[in-house]
């Protein structure tokens, strides 16, 4: 792509009265994804396309509620509400609420760290929930070899995935429509959803499985429903405090931050160009150019490009058992 074309595109973007940058997984799922996302965010910051209506940046995820998983602390360096695991005040607050003497301030491992840490003997067990890493992760040969060396693999899912087929223990979970809860949209909006049908067979909601597991291990969790869990979350997370179950039912949609019960939420962040940093200014990142890791060479002379299938969703983990869809996109 000529440099002239890139500059022309940037000038068009900068001159637009309002502009939004959305990116898919092609931007993020390669060796320089972090640098690219920082660059796109920097473009928005330097052109005034943050902090007002109809502008911004954001990823288009491969699944619903990826934002929700991050909001709830399913990250190696964050507790719920984006509170750092290395912050002493955060550790003290959560430890007191959860009735334990202390909590670890150590940053955990990312998903791509897992096979390497298994090889190093630092991970001996893996508890996989709603994920199919033996079907979807990069360098599957390494991932499968690492999983074969685990002393224990637990999978909690709604289908018998490739990963579940290798598990030592399987916990069958309810699927969408069989339980209630809250989703987060990509624009930080909380959306409450209701159970539509009773689950069939010996399956349980994710939260109940976790509660039973914790209780069996000596840490009793006595939640009766998702509202009790949500209210505990609100008390511990200032960003979410005002997003009550009752208000979500009435408004249908509450974007965080929502810090008080009379607030409708925050439709856009950084109003007035005030950022959550010392001095209130945004931070621009500079990334040095480096050649992509995914270039062909003598050892790997071919590039495999995968595409989306019309008849299946994503990696077939959820749709591969449907015979009608298999006829549309069979190998």
Each predicted region: which residue ranges?
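Long, well-ordered, tryptophan-enriched scaffold segments
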Residues: 1-16
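Acidic catalytic cores of enzymes that act on phosphate-bearing nucleotides/polynucleotides
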Residues: 17-119
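Conserved thiamine diphosphate
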Residues: 1, 196-198, 216
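Predominant activation on well-ordered alpha-helical scaffold segments within soluble catalytic domains
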Residues: 7, 37-44, 112-115, 144, ...
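A cross-kingdom feature strongest in bacterial/archaeal respiratory oxidoreductases
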Residues: 46, 79-80, 88-202, 231-331
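Acidic/polar loop patches that form or flank catalytic/metal-binding clefts of enzymes
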Residues: 20-21, 49-59, 155-156, 172, ...
